[in-house]
């Protein structure tokens, strides 16, 4: 027995030695040596690969790096860094090829240092034509401040820039530039001189570019939480002045917040906030957030695990896990899972008045409870074949665990003309039965010659079964059932074509939707069977041109929509309109550091959600019913905006004009058979307009990073055609104060406050409301891969919705509502061997998915 154990031990040691020899590990430190010398040394010291390169071609590129426990391809990739150098690995032949991507005889070289003589890493060097400042090439300095950039002209203009430092221009007539010293760019804030530091964001011709890596933003646990602390983000999750954004992660459309919860903030390199999206986005999109993750090399297993818990009146908890296995040839296999137990409570008091044949008053104390257990899982594969081609595929499934439960309970007193008419307790329970939903996404992104192709296709299939039961105590119970089936097929193609001047992008997008809804009830209204079919096909083109400091972007989208609406098996032509519309977008930008200005026009078009196009009347309580309106038309929005930015100060003025705006409205349901009952449905307002100013400031003083945003808006709505007499034009304001303190030993404190002062606008009056949130976090382990955070929201319990609304015909409502916002909890997340996802697919037909 001992002999057997001894033999097995020797065999294990021998196999380990063989494995280590087969996959030799590189541990080495380089200090300002040429890339050619480093490659030659690595080639001579190992036998796993043969490294092929041209010595003279790479001699100008110098390496300063510390390599620890890396295989040879990963070590070479780290040495290459941001240089215009490409590495090709041929594992079958055990060969590595390293070559410069720009075949020129000249390399512009130099070293960048700061005011204290320390090297400046990752500074941007742009090589310009001295005659017209057109961009000829560019690069980034390495860890020792050294840069080497291929160029061809005899004389060039070098522009060296780094956030927080003054930009340096150097006219170069020889390859060796020498040492360039950069000076901080200082500014004064209330008498305090603040020396140049990295700005939280920079301006682009489409919006803002926010750096996440290396800033306090990377210490927020999840990407979802991190996004709430970006510039221009308001407490309601919208971009100030631009509504709810569409979100992409590495070109893949985000389907829900659970995807953002699974992505760690420290895996994000940068975020682009697009407030002027082109026509390649859907006609309904008014703003976009594009997340770019940190690209890491490596093979084998990687993953992350996280959990969250919140406790208020009800509790919330979630866990998620992601695993990825990467092969040497760039192929990834991944699986993700997410599980949540979400419970919420809303309490509300209302005093409703309805003027019909009599004056009815309903005084209610209401409680809404929501209980849901849910899982999300997907399996996928993607293959980055080479630098020019990548493909991928993802299957996603999600479902409820048990019934999703929504309970509405209220105590109501009803008075007619000042006299007591009725009182009682009412309870309704709506159960959503578990139904497995499926979706499939596939994509191809590639370059064919000078043409770039981005293609994606989607299939989505979802069923739901809702069952409502309840009523008022002592009276006949009511019940209803709604069975819904949704199916979507969509595809999208975007092509970037080579043109002599500027950039041309064009493509097409198509989607088909088949939706059925079967509604049955116990006698309080009428049964119906509705089938809605929609086919949308669009073509679009964008052209952009940059001349010096001036940029012009123009785009046009032609959208064709065909609808078929069937009620109880019979087509209704009036409810089946066809549309053929043009969606134009235009922006002109001027950038001259530190100023950026832009003028833009944007047209968007929003189709009503399918759920409000139903004519079914559903039951809420004895005196409350709900319905939709199948005659609603798409809403068209026109927006003109002027934006200016100076360093960390942002300002924007917006004018908006809207057509066919759909609103919910309340009126008498049936004054004869249901006296005093209120019906909520949807109507169209022909036109509205609004004026808005958005301000944002993101200064940094030492450890204190500020991010303050404010909205000022005035609305000019005319609801007279709906029978609503009130039309106020009061100022609406919204303030967000986000403060992040970076503390020693990987601690971070965030204090965020928001306040919405008293508002009197359109047909409502809202009282002042606000909240105060805290987050204290710490990163653990040597690589800071473990993050633990204590979080508290709405500490002062001030986030009430309170006011008076006249949103109906002869209708008034005085209300006070609280959504269980005060909670305390914690987040824990851990990642290992983080080889970031290469999945690049986006989603076609996304607006139709949102409507479903």
Predicted region positions:
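Outer-membrane beta-barrel signature, preferentially recognizing the C-terminal barrel domain
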Residues: 532-534, 574-577, 605-659, 678-691, ...
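N-terminal periplasmic accessory domains that precede
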Residues: 95-100, 174-183, 191, 223-226, ...
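Short acidic/polar hinge/loop motifs at secondary-structure boundaries
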Residues: 148-150, 229, 235, 250-278
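Short, acidic Ser/Thr/Gly-rich low-complexity loop/linker segments typical of extracellular
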Residues: 131-146
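Short, acidic, small-residue-rich periplasmic hinge/interaction motif at the N-terminus
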Residues: 39, 45-46, 83, 92-105, ...
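N-terminal export/assembly leaders
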Residues: 21-103, 133-137, 198-200, 235-246
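Outer membrane beta-barrel strand-and-loop segments of large Gram-negative receptors
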Residues: 488-492, 536, 627, 633, ...
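Face-selective signature of the C-terminal outer-membrane beta-barrel domain
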Residues: 374-402, 424-568, 591-596, 649-653, ...
């Amino acid at each position: 027995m001992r002999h057997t154990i001894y033999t097995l031990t020797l065999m294990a040691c021998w196999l380990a030695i063989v494995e280590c020899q087969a996959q030799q590990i590189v541990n080495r430190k380089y200090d300002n040596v040429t890339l050619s010398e480093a490659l030659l040394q690595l080639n001579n010291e190992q036998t796993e690969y043969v490294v092929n390169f041209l010595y003279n071609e790479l001699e100008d590129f110098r390496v300063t790096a510390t390599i620890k426990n890396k295989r040879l391809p990963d070590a070479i990739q780290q040495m290459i860094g941001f240089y215009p150098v490409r590495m090709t690995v041929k594992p079958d032949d055990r060969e590595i090829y390293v070559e410069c991507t720009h075949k020129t005889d000249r390399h512009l070289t130099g070293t960048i240092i700061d005011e204290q003589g320390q090297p400046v890493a990752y500074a941007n060097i742009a090589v310009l034509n001295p005659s017209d400042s057109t961009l000829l090439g560019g690069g980034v300095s390495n860890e020792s401040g050294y840069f080497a950039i291929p160029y061809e002209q005899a004389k060039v203009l070098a522009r060296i820039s780094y956030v927080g430092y003054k930009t340096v221009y150097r006219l170069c007539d020889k390859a060796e530039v020498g040492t360039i010293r950069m000076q901080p760019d200082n500014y004064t804030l209330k008498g305090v001189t603040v020396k140049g530091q990295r700005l939280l964001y920079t301006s682009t011709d489409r919006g803002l570019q926010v750096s996440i890596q290396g800033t306090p933003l990377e210490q927020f646990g999840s990407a979802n939480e991190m996004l709430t602390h970006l510039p221009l983000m308001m407490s309601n999750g919208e971009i100030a002045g631009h509504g709810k954004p569409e979100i992409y992660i590495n070109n893949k459309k985000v389907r829900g917040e659970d995807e953002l919860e699974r992505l760690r903030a420290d895996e994000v390199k940068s975020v682009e906030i697009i407030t002027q999206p082109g026509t390649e986005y859907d006609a309904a999109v008014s703003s976009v957030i594009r997340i770019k993750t940190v690209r890491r090399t490596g093979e084998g297993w990687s993953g992350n695990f996280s959990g969250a818990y919140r406790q208020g009146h009800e509790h919330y908890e979630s866990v998620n896990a992601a695993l990825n296995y990467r092969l040497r040839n760039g192929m990834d296999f991944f699986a993700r899972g997410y599980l949540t137990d979400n419970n919420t409570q809303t309490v509300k008091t209302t005093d409703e008045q309805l003027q019909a044949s009599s004056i009815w008053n309903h005084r209610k104390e209401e409680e809404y409870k929501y209980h849901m257990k849910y899982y999300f899982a997907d399996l996928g594969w993607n293959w980055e074949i080479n630098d020019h081609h990548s493909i991928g595929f993802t299957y996603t499934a999600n479902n409820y665990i048990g019934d999703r439960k929504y309970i509405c309970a209220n105590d109501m007193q009803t008075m007619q003309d000042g006299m007591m008419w009725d009182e009682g307790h009412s309870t309704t329970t709506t159960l959503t039965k578990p139904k497995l939903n499926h979706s499939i996404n596939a994509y191809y992104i590639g370059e064919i010659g000078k043409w770039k192709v981005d293609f994606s296709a989607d299939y989505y299939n979802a069923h739901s079964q809702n069952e409502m039961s309840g009523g008022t105590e002592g009276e006949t119970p009511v019940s209803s059932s709604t069975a819904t089936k949704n199916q979507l097929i969509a595809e999208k193609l975007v092509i970037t074509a080579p043109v002599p001047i500027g950039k041309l992008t064009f493509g097409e997008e198509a989607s088909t939707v088949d939706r059925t809804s079967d509604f049955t009830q116990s006698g309080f209204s009428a049964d119906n069977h509705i089938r809605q079919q929609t086919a949308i096909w669009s073509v679009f083109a964008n052209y952009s041109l940059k001349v010096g400091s001036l940029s012009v972007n123009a785009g046009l989208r032609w959208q064709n929509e065909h609808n078929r609406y069937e009620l109880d098996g019979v087509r209704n032509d009036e409810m089946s309109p066809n549309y053929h519309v043009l969606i134009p977008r235009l922006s002109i930008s001027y950038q001259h550091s530190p100023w950026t200005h832009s003028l833009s026009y944007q047209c968007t078009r929003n189709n009503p959600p399918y759920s409000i196009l139903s004519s079914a009347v559903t039951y809420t309580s004895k005196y409350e019913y709900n319905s939709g309106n199948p005659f609603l038309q798409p809403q068209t929005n026109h927006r003109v905006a002027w934006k200016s930015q100076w360093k960390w100060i942002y300002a924007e003025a917006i004018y908006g004009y809207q057509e066919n705006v759909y609103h919910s409205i309340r009126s008498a349901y049936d004054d004869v058979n249901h006296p005093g009952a209120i019906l909520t449905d949807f109507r169209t307002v022909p036109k509205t307009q609004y004026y808005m100013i958005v301000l944002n400031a993101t200064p940094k003083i030492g450890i204190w990073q500020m991010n303050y945003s404010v909205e000022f808006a005035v609305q000019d709505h005319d609801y007279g055609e709906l029978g609503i007499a009130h039309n106020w034009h009061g100022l609406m304001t919204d303030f967000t104060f986000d403060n992040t303190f970076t503390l020693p030993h990987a601690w971070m404190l965030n204090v965020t406050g928001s306040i919405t002062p008293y508002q009197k606008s359109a047909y409502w009056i809202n009282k002042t409301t606000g909240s105060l949130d805290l987050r204290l976090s710490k990163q653990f382990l040597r690589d800071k891969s473990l993050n633990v955070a204590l979080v508290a929201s709405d500490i002062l319990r001030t986030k009430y919705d309170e006011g008076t609304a006249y949103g109906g015909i002869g209708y008034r409502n005085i209300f006070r509502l609280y959504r269980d916002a005060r909670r305390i909890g914690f987040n824990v997340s851990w990642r290992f061997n983080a080889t970031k996802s290469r999945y690049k697919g986006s989603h076609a037909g996304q607006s139709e998915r949102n409507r479903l």
